[in-house]
Regions:
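Canonical tetratricopeptide repeat
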Residues: 76, 115, 151, 185-188, ...
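Terminal, low-structured helical/coil segments at or just beyond the last alpha-helical repeat
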Residues: 174-212
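Alpha-helical segment of the N-proximal tetratricopeptide repeat
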Residues: 36-62
């Protein structure tokens, strides 16, 4: 899903270094002799910060073919694909970039983790999604944790791992209850109570069958 709230949070981290990024993203030769390309990179960032992800991707892709941009810019490209609902390409870029950007600020990384997890989830690659949701939980703000626990619960539920599903649904319920300001909290609290009960019933089925 598109999540403008997360995008805006990420942009707060970008603004500090935004003016330096075009300089350090390209080779020294490009910085000296191809100023139009540094301008192109700056324009790609402008498009990105304005939510014009398709236009941003066109410029990033052209520059990447010529110079091979660094991992952080590949992560930007992954986010662009995510916001364009192209989850396969989002996974391709984010899977490659994430191991190389561990030195970045925690909350910036949390947005890459969540976007990658959501991309795998939407591709029904639930086992692949879980580790990225878990990484997101480790570094995100408390009011953002519920969404990842909620998704992890579904990942396990789709694999019929009822105990793990129930545990994560319970964690999601706890965080949504603690943070009612989250947009989806009210509807998900009601849903989660039903989901938890359903998981508990599934956990009882093998025990009940022993007494038949």
């Amino acid at each position: 899903m598109k999540n403008n709230r997360q995008c805006k949070a990420l942009l707060r981290w970008f603004m500090v270094t935004l003016l330096l990024l075009p300089v350090y993203a390209l080779p020294v030769s490009a910085q000296k002799s191809k100023s139009p390309d540094t301008e192109k990179l700056g324009k790609a960032l402008d498009y990105f910060t304005s939510g014009m992800y398709h236009e941003s991707l066109l410029l990033f892709t052209a520059l990447d073919k010529e110079y091979t941009l660094n991992a952080r810019f590949h992560a930007f490209m992954g986010l662009c694909y995510y916001y364009e609902w192209d989850y396969q390409h989002a996974c391709t870029y984010l899977d490659e970039a994430i191991p190389k950007i561990e030195s970045l600020a925690p909350h910036e990384r949390s947005i890459y983790y969540f976007a990658n997890a959501e991309s795998h989830f939407n591709l029904e690659q639930y086992a692949e999604a879980i580790p990225f949701y878990e990484q997101h939980i480790m570094v995100c703000y408390p009011n953002e944790k519920a969404d990842s626990f909620y998704r992890i619960g579904f990942c396990y539920m789709f694999h019929e791992e009822w105990a793990n599903a129930c545990e994560n649904f319970e964690s999601a319920l706890s965080y949504y209850t603690q943070h009612p300001e989250v947009k989806s909290a009210r509807s998900r609290i009601a849903q989660l109570k039903t989901m938890i009960e359903g998981c508990r019933e599934k956990l009882q089925e093998p025990q009940d069958s022993l007494h038949i």
